[in-house]
Amino acid sequence: MNPNVKIIILNWNGWEDTIECLESLFQIDYPNYDIILVDNNSKDESIEKIHDYCAGKLTVQSKFVSYTSENKPIKYYEYSEKRYDTIEMDNKADPSNKLYILKNDKNYGFAEGNNIGIKIALRGDPEYIMLLNNDTVVENDFLSKLVTIAESDKEIGVVGPVIYYYDWDGKTDVPSNICGKVNISSYPGYYDMVDVNKHVDPANADCDWVSGAAMMLKVRDIPIKYLNNQLFFGNEDIDLCINLKNLGYKIINVHSARIWHKEGVSRKKRSSAVIKKVMMEIEVNLKFLKLHNKHYYLYLPLYLLQITLLYIRVSIGKVLPKN
């Protein structure tokens, strides 16, 4: 018995990454999955390029997966936002691995964009929903390994793979994100409040959160199925996991399941808009702190002091993330 998994991918002006991700997914060994590709009103040629890829007119260059024409053309079902209410997901009538393309009328952002996909995915009554970033490439057995572990314990609510950097100075075996712990009482900045494990142990890890870049939810069992759209820039996944953990569900990182993620390098290196990004992190982390610590006001003096120090450090060009 292979429970059905609905995989949700969010695209915004990123068709090259998206078709590489799709190519890796259409070569996995797990037999029972569907892909819901949510386009957040891209302004480039994303939809046209994805059409070309599905038709076999556009190949994929990747160091992790070899392009094949054997599974082309790929059948897809495409819907504009005004037709979302008409979408039906009947796995019994059509058990093949299907691709749904949803075209949003505007850019709803990460949380709400994924929530649109989740809402539609739930119509098919899947056992699992997988949130997967479009700039990832998956190993062919990653989903089989995630499902095996998730099915092994009824208390598991969320599982995730080990995430490696797509390219770290030419290396592909450098862990970017495994899982982590959250200490609400410490400095509430993204890089300090959240402890990220960078060591891959043989045993799976019971943790506080796994990354929303690759997060599989046991949606038939868990009471919380959507991301908090009041948060943004990296905390939606942590918020969901913490809420489920508080309800008694386990959050498990499956160390034998692997994917590669491009975003980790860009976040690590930062950009010319670094101060703006840091201020966004400060804002959302304060919201997160308010949600998860009723005595958050006791930490505000320290919070304000450390915000000032953080701003000074960024202004003089020092690197923020802890290694």
Tell what function each PLM region has.
Residues 23-32, 53-57:
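Short, acidic, metal-binding catalytic loop of nucleotide-sugar glycosyltransferases
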Residues 45, 136-149:
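Acidic donor-binding/catalytic loop of UDP-sugar-dependent glycosyltransferases
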Residues 111-128:
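Active-site nucleotide-sugar/metal-binding loop of Leloir-type enzymes
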Residues 125-137:
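Short beta-strand-to-loop acidic/aromatic patch adjacent to the donor-nucleotide binding site
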Residues 223-224, 229-232, 238-260:
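Catalytic donor-sugar/metal-binding loop of nucleotide-sugar-dependent glycosyltransferases
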